[in-house]
Each structure stands twice: as structure tokens, then as C-alpha cells.
Amino acid sequence: MKKSLNTICYRIFTNLANPTRIAVIEKLIDNPMSVTELATALGQEQSMISHNIKPLIQCNILTSHREGKKHILTVNLEIVAPLFDAIESHAEKFCPVAGKCLNEE
């Protein structure tokens, strides 16, 4: 059975609504790396990074492939680049005017 757009959007945006996951994506956009390298680069425990990459891999936001003993993580730019461009465009166009997108509540 095909999932509704509401369900799909909820799952994707829930997976992205986490500062650690966004930091992971930002780090990996230009430089694929292993979980260990990523944990070091972000100053996080490897277990925390592993916990946060699992849902990103399940939604195909990240991909993983093996190089020797390492699992190398890569950002799926086919989905992430246009999504981040749309978010950035929205923030530039509407947030300075409305001021609500960037305010913390």
C-alpha cells in the first residue's frame, strides 16, 4: 500500500529535525567519511553518531558503502541538495520579513 504524502513528509522532516543529524549532513556534503571520522569531526561519541545516522540511511538521505573495514557515509545529493536549496530560499524570502522562521520559541 502506498503511503500518504502526509506520512512521508512527517517521516522525512522528523528525521531532519535534529541538530546532530543536520550537522552530520553538513559535514558529509563535501566529504564522505566513516562513522569514526565523523564522530571525531563533530566532537561526538561514535555511539551517538551511529544512533543518528540510522534513520538518515533508512530514508535514503545518507548512503553507506564498505571500503575495507570501514563503512563510508555519503549524502544523497539527489534529494538533499534540492531540499536544502528550497529551505534556504524560503528562509531568505520569507523569514527576514515575517521573522518567525528563525526565532526560537
Located regions from the model:
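Amphipathic alpha-helical dimerization/coiled-coil segments
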Residues: 1-8, 80-105
